[in-house]
Amino acid sequence: MTKPVLFSTRSSNTSEEGQLLVEQIWTGNDYRNFNYLIACPESGEALAIDPLEYDLCLATAKGKGWEIAQVLNTHHHHDHIGGNEGIVQATGARVLAHAEAKGQIPDMDEGLVAGDIVKVGKTVELEALDTPGHTMSHICLLSRSENAALFAGDTLFNAGAGHCKGGGHPDSLYNTFASQLAKLSDETLIYPGHDYIVNNLNFTLDREPDNSSATKLKSEIEKQDTNNALVTNLGLEKEINTFFRLQSSSVIATLRVSFPDLPEELDDQTVFLKLRELRNVW
């Protein structure tokens, strides 16, 4: 029996978001990946997101009585597409990804562009967001159901942002944050591609030592069971994620210590890019 996710709280790793079921699968691998199954409660049809540990995904679907009909890759990195073949061989699922990832993801069946709707079963509709930055052909999926949810891949992490060292660009990542992610409702639940939350909170506190929300959350989740991980929402991310806190006086003050030659007037993009530069070597 599923248990609803209330914003910014723990729940069982299966949650019910309006008219869809979400299964967050902790892989326990060295990459600290989360894999996801999204299922239609009426038909039992499921979509697998970045199913690197395909055996876990298949076993979970079987245990739930779900049938995986589609795979969605948020981007082309191996730790997100490495399980495609196993899922496809077992289920015949179709593989979806960003339209411009066609030459990077083997046996891709359908390319998505911004605004495309991915349908799962009878009730589930997910909007494709074109979210370049981590890579230039990255897709996030947005559910606009009763409890909005973002399946963020490696664009947005809990308390952090994706790096751009594997074919992306930090200017594009900033634009994705500023023009898309920051404009989503604060209630939007965040489902990232990896569990980096503790290290990301450490970075937030290095940049903004007086961030009481980050301090409190870190003390609460340092020893969390990642099989039952915290699900944040965008409102909480705006409190604890330094990449959303570009006008914080503390963030700017510590940034000036790291980069003494910064101009007196700083725009948000410059702050974001300098934070990303620091996080690259954190």
Residue ranges of predicted features:
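Active-site metal-binding loops of divalent metal-dependent hydrolases
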Residues: 51-52, 76, 100-101, 134-135, ...
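Conserved beta-strand hairpin/beta-sheet module of binuclear metal-dependent hydrolase folds
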Residues: 10-66, 141-153
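Active-site-adjacent loop/tail segments of enzyme domains
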Residues: 160-187
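Active-site HxH/HxHxD metal-binding segment of metal-dependent hydrolases
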Residues: 31, 46, 53-130, 147-149, ...
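Accessory terminal helices/loops
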Residues: 2-13, 178-189, 196-282
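Active-site-flanking alpha-helical
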Residues: 82-83, 139-141, 161, 201
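Core dinuclear metal-dependent hydrolase active-site scaffold
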Residues: 37, 117-145, 180-183
